A protein has these predicted regions:
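Carbohydrate-active catalytic/glycan-binding domains of CAZyme proteins
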Residues: 1-233
């Protein structure tokens, strides 16, 4: 799924293999959330990402099961309908998981390629949401033990800091979430640390948090099921 903040609401879009593309929104991320809305009944779509431009136009990026291609649709401003059949803007090796971001006139598509455990992170950029797009590999496993790195998204903070949110595949642990340091050079994101100076960043395990908090929360790790509510919630 993708979660975005627009028009004073949080929006979540996701696909299921056989049922289609769904949307829900909420003023508060803890809910209540609107009833699921079926945007389009369709099979084998995946990784949808909504995007609202400054001019009020709305779009949706997505891919297909089997990894790719990357397709952009025009979408109604209320997120309830797709307005066309979509345009393919990129085809690559196992290209999927697109996340759309705009900065300084550039549209950026963050896409993983090469497979969940063996791939890398690519950024596409263009002055037009339909392309043509320039391509740059911005993050790879390299000499680290953080494979993938997969399904990344650009994150900005209210005070102007930047970070990159992604996961790695870790067998029994599943998909382990990481937050990488990020800054901009020549209108390209620079992510992690370029240890071997090949122009491509590598993930790090330790970095300065973009937002500091002195409050430490320990996640719930067990439940004795003594009440009607789950402790994990």
């Amino acid at each position: 799924p993708s979660i975005r903040y627009h028009d004073n609401k949080f929006w979540v879009f996701f696909c299921t293999p056989k049922e289609g593309l769904f949307m829900s929104n909420a003023v508060n991320p803890s809910g209540p959330w609107s009833p699921l809305h079926l945007v389009k009944k369709v099979e084998k779509w995946e990784d949808p990402c909504p995007f609202w431009d400054e001019d009020g136009q709305a779009y949706l990026g997505r891919s297909r099961h089997g990894a790719g291609p990357i397709i952009i649709h025009k979408m109604s401003a209320d997120g309830t309908r797709l307005l066309d059949e979509g345009m393919t803007v990129y085809t690559g090796p196992v290209a999927e998981g697109t996340k759309i971001f705009k900065k300084d006139g550039y549209y950026y598509l963050s896409i993983p390629e090469g497979g969940v455990g063996t791939g890398w992170q690519t950024i596409l950029r263009s002055k037009n949401i339909y392309g043509p797009y320039e391509k740059k590999v911005v993050l790879e496993q390299g000499s680290t033990t953080i494979n993938g790195p997969h399904q990344g998204a650009i994150v900005d903070t209210p005070d102007g800091q930047w970070a990159f949110f992604h996961f790695q595949h870790h067998h029994a642990l599943g998909r382990v979430v990481h937050l990488q340091p990020m800054h901009w050079e020549n209108d390209w994101p620079v992510i992690g640390v370029d240890f071997d100076r090949n122009g491509i960043g590598e993930p790090v395990y330790v970095c300065q948090k973009p937002i500091e908090s002195k409050t430490i929360f320990a996640p719930q790790t067990d439940d004795d099921f003594s009440t009607p509510n789950l402790c994990l919630l």
